[in-house]
Design a protein with these regions (language model features):
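Beta-strand-loop-alpha-helix segment that lines the small-molecule cofactor/substrate pocket
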Residues: 76-134, 149
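N-terminal Rossmann-like dinucleotide-binding module
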Residues: 1-56
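Predominantly a Rossmann-like dinucleotide-binding segment in NAD(P)-dependent oxidoreductases
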Residues: 133-234, 288, 374
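Hydrophobic residues in well-ordered beta-strands that form the structural core
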Residues: 62, 102, 127-129, 158, ...
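Glycine-rich phosphate/pyrophosphate-binding beta-alpha loops
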Residues: 196, 255-264, 323
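Core-facing hydrophobic residues within beta-strands of well-ordered domains
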Residues: 36-38, 74, 154, 209
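Short acidic low-complexity segments
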Residues: 31, 60-73
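C-terminal glycine/acidic-rich active-site capping loop/insertion
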Residues: 211, 221-237, 241, 245-246, ...
């Protein structure tokens, strides 16, 4: 007999859709004892949230998140709201005994994150943060190769996440669609939005980051705010680049911008070790590029592993070898790991929880502090 986990989703935008798709797909492709049930969705616009509930198969809807988290027929709450509300909603969920699945980043800053971690760990409630890219098969394969020690000593890690959607000066800030440009709602710009993904993956694969030296730039200093209709200062970072040192002694370069004309979502990382190197590109997400210095010189060169075989992480749960997976599958994979953990609570967690996400938040905080001070900044331990 399957054990139902009744989900309450708060927010029905881009992430609300991706998470809802994962809830709908999980039981078709992964055999877990606990299964999600789409119980309720919450949004402020009654007409829109009702339509979303009907389209995605939620049994009911609310227009006030406070009412949703108090409902006795909700077991777990999925927070898909702007960053400034994560902490408040999560703390209310904990008071009401709800499991939490929270969008990234964990909070606006480390101080908020600490409060969330302290409360959720005291409660013992299962908790997850949606850092999804690590659950793409090729990325998980990279982690497995590094963990097996195949690279030897790691020397370098580099990552970038490039977009171009905010170049126009006519683009306003704030509101439902553009809250990422409003510091009050987002906390930061590309650092918390895009680099947080790069940092999470890097820490997962290569260990903790101990210090950073960063620079940021806001290219357009003022934008019309949708709430007031008047021009206001833009205080988020449009671009950020930083150097980093890992605990294992390796060096790193990270870069992110929303001003790289021609790039819609270019996320790449590369790891260089004494024996092997690995590289990955979101645009070719099913492939992991692999260089092995140990093969004979006349056979040496970069090769591509098509991570769609049944032996590759997660791929065997889907189609036959050679058929590709996409961005949306990463959310189903993360959800599968969460539900496997509910099935076996004593097993090692294979997904990012609040404490791991707090470590990423600390790196983001250090990056912003370094950019402001112009100095190297040590990263707080989570």
């Amino acid at each position: 007999m399957k054990k139902e986990i009744r989900i309450g989703l708060i927010g029905y935008g881009f992430m609300g859709r991706t998470h809802s798709n994962a809830y709908s797909q999980l039981s078709h492709f992964f055999d877990t004892e606990h299964v999600p049930v789409r119980q309720a969705v919450c949004g402020r616009d009654q007409q829109k949230v009702a339509a979303f509930a009907e389209k995605w198969g939620y049994a009911s809807y609310e227009t006030d998140w406070r009412e949703l988290v108090k409902r006795p027929d909700i077991d777990a709450v999925d927070i898909c709201t702007p960053n400034d509300s994560h902490a408040e909603i999560a703390l209310e969920c904990i008071k009401n005994g709800k499991m939490i699945l929270c969008e990234k980043p964990l909070a606006l800053n480390g101080a908020q994150g600490e409060e969330m971690v302290k409360a959720v760990e005291a409660s013992g409630l299962p908790n997850l943060v949606w850092y999804n890219y690590r659950f793409l098969p090729a990325v998980t394969l990279a982690k497995n190769i590094v963990d097996a020690g195949e690279l030897g000593r790691v020397f370098h890690y580099r990552a970038n996440f490039l977009q171009d959607w905010t170049i126009s000066e006519e683009l306003p800030q704030g509101g439902a669609g553009l809250w990422r440009l409003d510091a009050a709602a987002a906390g930061s710009g590309v650092t918390g939005d895009l680099l947080a993904h790069c940092i999470d993956t890097a820490r997962w694969i290569n260990g903790d980051i101990v210090s950073v030296s960063a620079m940021t730039e806001t290219f357009i200093k003022e934008r019309v705010h949708t709430a007031t209709g008047a021009k206001q200062a833009v205080t988020i970072d449009d671009a950020c680049a930083f150097l980093a040192r890992f605990e294992n002694g390796s060096l790193a370069i990270f870069e992110s911008t929303r001003y790289a004309r021609g790039h819609k979502a270019l996320y790449t990382f590369e790891i260089n070790g004494e024996k092997k190197s690995l590289a990955w590109d979101l645009h070719d997400m099913n492939y992991l590029s692999y260089f092995d210095h140990g093969v004979p010189g006349d056979r040496r060169g970069w090769t591509n592993i098509h991570a769609t075989d049944g032996d590759h992480p997660y791929s065997g749960n889907w189609w036959v070898p050679g058929l590709c997976l996409g961005y949306e599958h990463s959310f189903t994979h993360e959800l599968a790991e969460f539900f496997k953990s509910l099935d076996n609570p004593t097993a090692e967690k294979r997904y990012p929880d609040f404490r791991h996400a707090l470590g990423t938040q600390y790196v983001c905080d250090a990056v912003l502090e370094s950019a402001k001070s112009g100095q190297w900044v040590d990263v707080k331990k989570s």
